[in-house]
Amino acid sequence: EQLRDAILSVQAGQLKAAELAWQEGISANIAQGFHHAVYDHGNAFCTFNGLALVAKQFPDKKIFILDCDQHGGNGTAEYTRFIPNLFNFSIYGLAFVCATYEQSITRHIHPKTGNFDEYTQAVFAGFEHAQEWGADLIIYQAGMDCHRKDRFGSKWFSTDLLYDRDQLVFALAKKHKFPLMFVLAGGYQKLDELVPLHVNTFKAANS
């Protein structure tokens, strides 16, 4: 019962955050997008895909997912095959079988040999696709598991660079006048190390 109520609250938060983004220009849901969940089952700690839910709930709006979790958004990618108003753009270090489809594009930045310049180029590419597609809303999965101290992280991705990534995403959304909602995403460090990284995302959103 507690799990059920928690899941329903999270998903209600996704829908409310989308509405607030259209009203205010920017919003957040203090929860994850659960991007590994597919249509008929949960997957990898993800119950129901809240990113796809937004597209399903608002069929007249084009929902563009900018997924910056270290693991590719494989579940969201699968949803793009039958939800026409959903586009998935995943920038990741670990593939997690994230497929490429007509409306699912991936950018792999190697956790050892990659660098932040490659990463920022991928972010710019994501916004170019959002413009070309005519997105009505960007949902930003602000993953923290790419941090260099995370067990899944990229060795070059420092705390300062994560903050720079967040600032870049918010600045580009504002520049191109995209309503944007963001959700928290992966992070497997100890809580006292992880929470400040998530807090930085909120600071970047208000900078």
Q: How would you name each of these model-derived features?
A:
Residues 24:
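Active-site acidic/histidine proton-transfer and metal-coordination neighborhood
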Residues 15, 19, 28-175, 199-203:
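Conserved alpha-helical scaffold segments that buttress catalytic/binding sites
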Residues 146, 186-190:
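A short, acidic, flexible beta-alpha connecting loop/helix-capping segment that sits on the rim
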Residues 189-207:
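C-terminal active-site-proximal or functional interface alpha/beta core segments in diverse enzymes
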Residues 112, 185-186:
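A general structural signal for short secondary-structure boundary/capping elements
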Residues 179-184:
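Short acidic/histidine-rich active-site segments
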Residues 1-7:
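Active-site neighborhoods of divalent-metal-dependent phosphate/nucleic-acid chemistry enzymes
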